Amino acid sequence: MDTPLLSDRERLIQALEASDQRRREHRADRIEWLALYEVTPPVVIGRPETMHMLREAREVFVDGHFVAALMMAMSFIEHTVVEELQLLGHVSGSPTFAQAIERAKEKKTFPPDWLLRAKTLSLRRNPFAHLKQGDHPHTLGARVRHEKKHPRVIVETDAKDAIELMYNFFVATLREDA
């Protein structure tokens, strides 16, 4: 019996269905993990860029794109820290993230342990955003050698820490409309 030839589109759909099936359990695990930290008020109004980063950090994390989740979560945190400092009159303009962290520490804008975690995660994010020498201590290769863990485990752990911290900053800066 002759099997009908499938179009490229039909083969693509079949491949996507198989991929979805293989990844479904892991995505469900990540959604359940996110539920421990995620806060979703009925209405949130904020800067469109910042709100998109919050949503995209969640989405790429669920899909297992851990470097992207780290990048998005840290971008959200940077926006949030700087915006809070601006709203409180502690800075004007757009300071660097390192400057914003230091200013937030001075002004006690956020808990010091959050700011320390944000600084650490920023250093871990930087080799993905800015090319570093191969032996730089924050590169993934150097961390794999030092921590003796698989790269995927390292970036997943970083992503989880960044996502959790992102939701901490999100909740801390929620305001009721007056």
Functional labels for PLM-detected ranges:
Residues G64, T80-S92, F128, K132-D135:
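Amphipathic alpha-helical interaction segments
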Residues I13-E17, M51-L54, M74, A118, ...:
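Generic structural concept
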Residues E38-T40, K107, K148:
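A short, mixed-charge helix-start or loop-turn motif at secondary-structure junctions
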Residues P112-A178:
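Charge-enriched, short contiguous segments at helix-coil
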Residues L85-L123, A142:
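Short, charged amphipathic alpha-helical segments flanked by flexible coils
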Residues M1-H65:
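Charged alpha-helical initiation segments
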Residues A18-R22, K107, A172, E176:
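Surface-exposed polar/charged interaction patches
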Residues A57-R58, V62-Q86:
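Short, hydrophobic, well-ordered secondary-structure elements
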